[in-house]
Amino acid sequence: MSILPVIFLSIFFYSSFVQTFNAPECIDKGQYFASFMELENEPVILPCPQINTLSSGYNILDILWEKRGADNDRIIPIDNGSNMLILNPTQSDSGIYICITTNETYCDMMSLNLTIVSVSESNIDLISYPQIVNERSTGEMVCPNINAFIASNVNADIIWSGHRRLRNKRLKQRTPGIITIEDVRKNDAGYYTCVLEYIYGGKTYNVTRIVKLEVRDKIIPSTMQLPEGVVTSIGSNLTIACRVSLRPPTTDADVFWISNGMYYEEDDGDGDGRISVANKIYMTDKRRVITSRLNINPVKEEDATTFTCMAFTIPSISKTVTVSIT
């Protein structure tokens, strides 16, 4: 037997051993916190989630994509592998997709959950993106989850449809993908559809998003009534009333008093009970009214100071009264 084949065979096994020994073990970072639900027969782009978490000194040599338990022939790596594309997905494309990043000394992987659904009335709440505006305000409605498709075409044309209110002059598209709604009304609520044209390989594909717009009641600021000043005398019994009026959707507030760094709340006196707070709540004219009474009995010289009534709500409000002693 010639010694030459033996030498080549030894070199081959040694090389394979060294490559296997040097290959870094791949760290599984688990599943990405967000799941993806996309429409059947429309392009889907998934991001490699761990790329943004890698340190600036990490040099990625290769990014690989695969689907757990299936062939990878439906996956199209784009943007140097940092995203993956499926052009005409079907429900069979639902599943777990894995992004693997490697270099000479490091390897990690992270998975994403993709669900492909059909467009139907029964699925509309599953596939729609909820957005909220307030009545009688100026609000915005944004075509959601399209950044990956417009990264290379910031001037992409986006067409809105699906709601009769789009013909109203109060709704204007000043920026692609954003509808400004002036003087929001209750009947602006509903489902709106935005469609983006995505071009890949010389072909045009539609990317559809459905927005479920909710219009919340107009926020009427809470009001507070409190005198600017009161005059009393030493030894007297003084009561100061602070009246807080709330309108829906704001229906509750914590009302308390502050003076010289001390807090005075209902059922929480200053130790000797000389200063106390009593709150009363009642409804009137669709308003919830909280009357907070600060009682000082007896009045001392040290009470010639300021007391602030604070209503902790959204937004919080406060007023201050000055106590003078004659």
Swiss-Prot record:
Domain Ig-like per the UniProt entry, residue ranges: 24-115, 122-212, 221-322
GO molecular function, one term: interleukin-1 binding
Protein's gene: OPG201
Single biological process term from Gene Ontology: symbiont-mediated perturbation of host process
Location, primary (coarse class): secreted
Sugar attachment sites: N80, N103, N113, N206, N237
Pfam families documented for this protein: ig
InterPro entries: Ig-like_dom, Ig-like_dom_sf, Ig-like_fold, Ig_sub, Ig_sub2, IL-1-bd, IL-1_rcpt_fam, IL-1_rcpt_I/II-typ
Gene Ontology cellular component terms for the protein in this record: extracellular region
Disulfide bonds: C48-C99, C143-C194, C242-C309
Protein name as catalogued: Interleukin-1-binding protein
Entry annotated with the keyword Glycoprotein: yes
UniProt function note: May reduce the host inflammatory response by interacting with inteleukin-1 beta (Il1b) and thus decreasing the association between IL1B and its cellular receptor.
Species in which this protein is naturally found: Vaccinia virus (strain Ankara)
Entries under PANTHER family matching the protein: INTERLEUKIN-1 RECEPTOR FAMILY MEMBER, INTERLEUKIN-1 RECEPTOR TYPE 2
Compartment list: Secreted
Keywords, alphabetical: Disulfide bond, Glycoprotein, Host-virus interaction, Immunoglobulin domain, Repeat, Secreted, Signal, Viral immunoevasion
Family of this protein: Belongs to the interleukin-1 receptor family.
Signal peptide bounds: 1-18
Subunit structure: Interacts with mouse Il1b.
